Amino acid sequence: MEKRYLSLANNLINDLLESSSSSSDDEELGVLLNPKTNCLRVNNFVNEVSTCTQAAGFCCNKTTICEVSNLFNVSYSCAHNVINNVVSFLIGLSPDIIKFPQSATEKEIISNEFAAISGFPNVLGCIDGTYISIRAPKKKFVQHTYINRHDTISVTMQGICDANLKFFDVFTGVASKVDDSRVLKLSFIGKELPKLCLPKYHVLGDSAYPIRNYLLTPYRDYGNLTEQEKRYNYKFSQTRVRIENAFGLLKCRFRQLMRLDFHEVETTAKFILACCVLHNVCIDKQDFIEKKEYCVDPASVQEQHFPFEVSDTVLTELDEIKRSQIKSLF
């Protein structure tokens, strides 16, 4: 393991232990971090620090379970069990760590943080999808659905983040051939988003999404945009790039996400979610990586364009009013 990321793994230990708020969680964590399986070291004991470092070190480095077991002088099955147990524990914490703001005060604070970026008003979050490369699924008849537009096998991770790159919502495990607007419809947040954005808020998405009162998109540039529309798009991109940076930071911090070699897509999805939990914990602890390693230039982001359904086109005409009102501010 690279020293830098092993150090990061060690820094995650205390964050992981502190993330459980109740005594029952603490007891559960103790059981998970000290599994009575064939975990053998020289002194026949695996302490919590070693266990956490094994799991976090695996997440933060592009390494294998075999290499982790050799590094910590434990059996392969022990390292495998440790990683699975910590992932399960993190997923149990996810409802408390990855959650959408509910109160009016929370929403106002988040909106003000976004407004401070470029002046774009009433933004509650930024949404997008990203590909995470995986091993080809076992079932050959579905393998082609996991080949993305870059001709690589992957799953899509949909994320919604705040201005500090912290995830509000994560949905993953969907075959990468499915476009972003369809992934949103399939996700749990898809039906809840209109209510969560009441009374005046919205999330920002790229042109892959249909415009909604609660989901604003940029103006498509066919060479005939007005100066006001160009200013709208500029401020929009300056704000929406936060989700690109959130994905970049996630993948930079957890190098295992460069390519996941799990045999089951379900296991892959669980691991991605666990990394997102740790990502949020790190942000809460203000543990950041140098921006130059993950920041994306808004001008370099290529918009995706997909045809919408007829019903979407009708709704778009109604929801265009809000975008026009915001455009008039610029």
What are these regions (language model features)?
Residues 1-6, 64-330:
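Short, well-ordered secondary-structure "scaffold" segments embedded in the functional core
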Residues 57-61:
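Short helix-capping/turn signature of helix-turn-helix
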